[in-house]
Structure formats: C-alpha cells, structure tokens
C-alpha cells in the first residue's frame, strides 16, 4: 500500500491512501459539529482519521475516539499520529454495531460520522473492497450509526453527520428512531445555480422537536473556493 502524508498544519499530518482518503465533506462536517475543548467525542467510521485530526487544528476536544472496523484505516491513523503533535486521539478498531469493550456508553458530548452515502447494491460499486465499504452501506447503515450514537451519547449529546440530499428522509427517520432529535440542518451547493449535493445535520439525544434550517453553504465562487469554504479550510492554522 502506498501512503501519502497530507499536511493540515506544520504539526498535523494525515496519512492517506487509495483505500482511505478524504474530501471536502470531512472539513465541512468537522466545522459544522462546533466541537469544544471540553467535549468528549467519537468519530464513527473514521477512515484515515481526517475528522479527529482536523479537530486538532484549534483547541482540540478533551478526548476523541476514532473508530473504524478496518485495520488498514486504523493503521493509517496511527501513522498520521506518529508524524503529528496531537492530544487525546484514541484509535479504536471495532465494529460500530457492537462497539468495543470499555466503550464510554452514555458519556459523550458529540458523535460525528461521515457515513457511506449509498444503500447497498445502489449504483456502481468500486472493485476495491475498502472503497465499497466507504461508499455503500455494506458493513453498516445509517440506522446502525444512529443506534451506536444513542448508546454513546449522554442526554443532550449531539450527533453530526453528512450525507447526500436524497438520503435526508432516511437520516431523519433513523435519528428519531433512536431518540436523537434533528435540531440543525444545512445544505451545501457548489454555487447558487446548482442544487445541493450534500447536507449537514445535527441531532440531540432526548431533545424536543424543533429544527433550524441554516443558510445554504456555497463552496465555489468566480475565483475558485468561496470565502466561507476557505475560512473552513483555514480554521486553526498557526499564525506567524
């Protein structure tokens, strides 16, 4: 396996490969989650650990459990951690449907997940197994994600996920089925002329119904990346 180290800051690196890589959606989700330094966090299906590592760019959470069922993904995260200066990231190789021995049940402030976007057998599936797992609900579904989050979160704890707009009803139904009430929703488009290609949603465990729809996020401008997207990418960079 060929690895490439992607630089987030002078002190934080992500180990990426063709099997476990990352895109813009990871940065959007990390920013949308509004994590705090005192938070106890878990990132489900962490892959190369991009979301926990992004969270290290400014005041990091107290602890972040980075969970993935694939040993190759956890190995890449460990390689990234070896090259970086980080605090509180705990790599965990486990099935989110079963969690792991000693999992902090009912203790977490925040769970994040950038899940597989496609239902199993929907659309063209990649030949590489790791890519299938990342794109299709082969090893877990959005319902499995919400069930795991419900077990991990304390009362009032938050679940933040992203997905394709066509899966919005599935995500809301799964959240509500596990006592996680959708509270914030934001759609993401390339520009004002195009339909959204992504949504970001936050749910709170045990909360009462009321959802705020936030202004749409546009990621492109005439000159390239939009100002807001650039701020999201730049958040936490060391000042010289």
Named regions from a protein language model:
Residues 1-36:
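Class I SAM-dependent transferase core
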Residues 13, 63, 88-90, 181-184:
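Conserved beta-strand segments of alpha/beta enzyme cores
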Residues 16, 93-94, 163, 186:
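Short loop/edge segments at beta-strand edges and connector loops
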Residues 22, 139-196:
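Conserved Class I SAM-dependent methyltransferase catalytic core
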Residues 29, 114, 145, 203:
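Residue-level signal for inorganic ion chemistry
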Residues 31-124:
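Conserved SAM/SAH cofactor-binding pocket of Class I
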Residues 115-144:
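Mobile active-site "lid"/loop adjacent to the S-adenosyl-L-methionine
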Residues 195-240:
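SAM/dcSAM-binding transferase cores
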């Amino acid at each position: 396996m060929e690895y490439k180290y992607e630089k987030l800051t002078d002190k934080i690196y992500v180990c990426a490969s063709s099997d476990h890589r990352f895109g813009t959606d990871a940065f959007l989700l990390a920013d949308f989650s509004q994590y705090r330094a005192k938070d106890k966090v878990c990132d489900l299906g962490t892959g190369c650990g991009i979301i926990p590592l992004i969270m290290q760019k400014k005041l990091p959470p107290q602890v972040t459990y980075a969970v993935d069922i694939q040993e190759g993904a956890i190995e890449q995260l460990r390689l990234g951690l070896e090259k970086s200066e980080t605090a509180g990231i705990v790599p965990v190789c486990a099935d989110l449907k079963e969690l792991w021995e000693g999992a902090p049940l009912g203790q977490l402030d925040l769970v994040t997940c950038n899940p597989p976007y496609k239902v199993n057998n929907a659309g063209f599936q990649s030949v590489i197994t790791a890519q299938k797992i990342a794109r299709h609900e082969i090893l877990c579904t959005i319902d499995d994600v919400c069930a795991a989050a419900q077990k991990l979160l304390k009362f009032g704890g938050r679940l933040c996920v992203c997905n394709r707009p066509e899966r919005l009803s599935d995500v809301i139904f799964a959240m509500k089925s596990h006592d996680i009430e959708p509270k914030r929703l934001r759609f993401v488009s390339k520009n004002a002329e195009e339909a959204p290609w992504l949504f970001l949603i936050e749910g709170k465990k045990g909360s009462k119904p009321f959802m705020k729809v936030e202004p749409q996020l546009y990621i492109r401008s005439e000159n390239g990346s939009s100002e807001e997207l650039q701020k999201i990418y730049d958040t936490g960079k060391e000042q010289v």
